[in-house]
Amino acid sequence: MLDIKFIRENPELVKENIRKKFKEHKLPLVDEVIELDAKKREVNTRANELRATRNKISKEIGALMAQGKREEAEEKKQLVSRQAEELAELERLEAELAAALNERMMKIPNIIDPSVPIGKSDEDNVEVQVYGETKVADFEIPYHTDIMAKFNGIDKAAAGKVAGEGFYYLMGDIARLHSAVLSYARDFMIDKGFTYCIPPFMIRSNVVTGVMSFEEMDAMMYKIEGEDLYLIGTSEHSMIGKFIDTFTNESELPLTLTSYSPCFRKEKGAHGIEERGIYRIHQFEKQEMIVICKPEESMEWFNKMWSYSVELFRSLDIPVRTLECCSGDLADLKVKSYDVEAWSPKQGKFFEVCSCSNLGDAQARRLGIRIKGADGSKYLAHTLNNTVVAP
């Protein structure tokens, strides 16, 4: 979410950014925002004038009453009453305009970093780095689910009866291995100086709309029926939400946290739930990292967080490559993003295991995450997130 002043003063820059993301259908939003903002400010000015006049007349009424001029006082009371009706209508209109303005502003993409490659889809993402030797075996490699089944470590059939497709039971040594990978990732991040946290696994709607776009929300989130609660799709959601409406002293920054949680995703719009594998599923567990920092430090932290992902997989001797997401593949709130992919010997290709993202001040603006400077200044923080591991 961009600053309204920025949109007002740079409409063509905002439109050009939308074009770079190949989302021309969002271009009308810019003019609509500017028009609604002008109307809202006009209404606000008139409302403030009425409030000032009302306060002035109220003082005059008191003076007239003290002088015994009741008839003149009564006339002014009637004027105040009429102004009160007009003010109530203006306040209603202002709230209506504010809601319409906010709805449109939430749909305008964040300004991407100048270094982001221009492209329409993930097919245009750019390779940044490759680590390790990718080998294609000269023998038939079994599916990972077949290996798990050999050790009696997975039961998809029972899970299908209990919850449907996209779920599974992990058991025995496979379940222990799953937990061990998460524990290894947790300790890896703690050694990097991150504070370990287990967050709430449900969040309110204002946090959901604070951390993601409407498109992402519709494609990912499960809503709890009858409650203003959603199951988290990643612990980033509740971890960033932890700092809603807060001020953090500059001296306390950066805030570096690593969190564990189960994650719940509809996977709406994905290429289906895999028949043989357990890659795109509705429930999984993940270790996450988030950073809240000063704006001038966010790109430095972006590179650090990405390097931690690569280092973790290198420590496990797993070949990985990094792709920079092009403009059209970036979610609306993101300024810059890298996907880290691991090599699958069975499939003979890389697949995504981490997504490192810098969101600038977009989430901070929506959620009111602010920094208090040593000189008393107050400004928005930058937020970043990255997957550690999701076994």
Region roles according to the model:
Residues 1-134, 149, 153:
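N-terminal alpha-helical targeting/anchoring segments
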Residues 27, 130-391:
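TRNA-recognition modules of translation machinery and tRNA-sensing kinases, especially anticodon-binding
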